[in-house]
């Protein structure tokens, strides 16, 4: 049985850090860089998530476990995204959700520190409160 492991938590809660030693991983931030040239470009989320669905489905050809990194805090988008992966995939798979504790103050501090230190990450400070309410 195949296994899709997805992250769930607000921006800055540690999802990408947790995924660093996992393989293979599809992350929306990485796709924004690759496809749009800008980690902060959220103007084409449909395109980004459709590409993510396709890549995840394709990775199951070679791997039994595949990881997906994104906030996924909005349940309406989460369900439709997971359905799109299922629709594209020829394999049956189980979905495991890794829920990250979310503290807006901690996330804000982490993001500010990363940006100050020149770490490539989305400047998503303006979305934390909205994500936390959805979480």
PLM features: what roles do these ranges have?
Residues 16-66, 73:
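Conserved substrate/cofactor phosphate-moiety recognition/catalytic segment
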Residues 54-57, 61, 79, 83-86, ...:
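Surface-exposed alpha-helical segments enriched in charged/polar residues
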Residues 4, 47, 60-61, 88-89, ...:
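Compositionally biased low-complexity segments enriched in polar/charged residues
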Residues 8-9, 68-71:
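Short His-Asn-centered micro-motif
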Residues 45-53, 75, 101, 125-132:
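Amphipathic alpha-helical transducer elements in NTP-driven molecular machines
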Residues 34, 73-119:
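ATP-dependent NMP and nucleoside kinases share a basic, alpha-helical "lid"
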Residues 66-68, 113:
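Short glycine-rich, basic-tinged beta-strand/loop micro-motifs
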Residues 1-8, 13, 17, 23-24, ...:
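Conserved GTP-binding G-domain of TRAFAC-class P-loop NTPases and closely related GTPase folds
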